[in-house]
Amino acid sequence: MHLKISDMDMLHGSLAGKLLLFTLPIALSSMVQQLFNAADTAVAGHFGSANALAAVGTNTEIIALIVTVSSGLSIGANVLIAKHVGRNEAEKLPAAVQTAMRLAMCIGVIGLLLGQIAAAPLLRLIRTPEEIFDAAALYLRIYMLGYPFLLLYDFSAACLRARGDSRYPFLALLLSGFANVGLNLLFTAGLRMGVAGVAIATDLSTMLSAFLVLRRLAKDAVFRFAILNQRSARNGVWSILKTGIPSAVQGAVFCFANIFVQASVNRFGAEAIAGSTIAMNFEYVTYYIITAFAQAATTFTSQNHAAGEFWRCRRILRLCLGLSLLCSTVPFFAIVLFRDTLSGLFTPNAAVIQSAGVRILCMLLFEPLCNLYEIPAGVLRGSGYALYPALSTMVGTCAFRIAWIYTVFRAKPTLPMLYHAFPLLWAATIVLTALGLLALRPFAPGSEHPHTTAQSRRV
């Protein structure tokens, strides 16, 4: 059965242009998703109080953990679909998509229930100040009501991207992003609903994005998704979880370590929390450029690895590293140069702007280092080695970072000393990931495809 790839053929021809075309919508999608939270922060800061801004802000790392776990789990669906595409197994795609959507809904409902139970304990864990605790808990509980729709969007988008369609998920998220801003202003500035209005706006916009991508899956001639269809892929759940769980753990461990950092930031009061929140919005937006290339590396590697095109897998690694470094460095330095002006978009409070500047100076200058472990990790996941990147992240970012907090930071408890941990631990993770790439050797040596042509070799 002939399989028509939606937007591009990842198995033949030039790679560089296709990687850029594929990556740009993913990066923009992630940025728009982060702008949901940035809009929440900006509206809370301008139409509420400093405490309202801090209540939303203290949830930033918890929500980043939730979003990262969802995205990580969806990578399993992406790899499963991409391997079927690489092997030209079009007949297996409808059942695989059906399995992915059922799994997303089941995990989403479980997450919704856990969110209602765990909201207060999580906020206690990170030492949320009492003056903002109730508002922060309310925001998190309402936010978690939309968790099933977040998972449905992520899994649906992962399925579409596996066939080369990264454009439609971006357009769906862009539309819901505009809706989020409008609803934020309506509920918070107009109806004065406070942090509850901010959270409800995010939930409704997430529902819209999920509806749009599910509609696309239903109309796709190959996927043929239908809610009442009972087809399922044999071993499909295990195939998704085998890659998805390590990827989710990798992201979760990274965010979990950041929650420990957030707990340390919380000791410095509401202004430090608000400043850190503003800086994190910029960090995530720029970091998503890197993770978009890592996602591209995973998808392209999955298809080519399944098709036996190992030489192209090596080319994918090199190109993604080079392009990601090139595309990410300029925004990092632009944010550093204009940090005060950009922070002023979120709040007029001079002390908060200064606090945001401290974090930006300590971290964003070094964030391009993340390319050197995220891209190889994406290639390893696409090659079927999802566990090692999770383990290296667990050691390099979680264990070392927590150790830093309880040793170096405890000896000198200042915000710069806390933030300096990040670039040092990124370097440690780079070393661990490089060792894994050398040891696992995911691309067989001398595995040039016998039918490779000059056209397919051309970058």
Residue locations for each model-derived region?
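Transmembrane helical elements of multi-pass membrane transporters/channels
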Residues: 21-40, 142, 153, 176, ...
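Small-residue-rich hydrophobic transmembrane alpha-helices
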Residues: 41, 53-113, 150-169, 275-333, ...
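Residue-level signal for transmembrane alpha-helical positions in Major Facilitator Superfamily
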Residues: 20, 24, 36, 73, ...
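Helix-terminus/linker motif at the lipid-water interface of multi-pass membrane proteins
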Residues: 31, 35-54, 123-130, 186-193, ...
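Short alpha-helical transmembrane segments in multi-pass integral membrane proteins
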Residues: 1-23, 81-146, 188-245, 301-366, ...
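Transmembrane alpha-helix boundary and packing residues in multipass membrane permease domains
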Residues: 26, 30, 42, 79, ...
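N-terminal transmembrane alpha-helices
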Residues: 10-47, 61-76, 80, 105-112, ...
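Short runs within selected transmembrane alpha-helices of multi-pass transporters and secretion channels
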Residues: 74, 143-161, 169-180, 198-213, ...
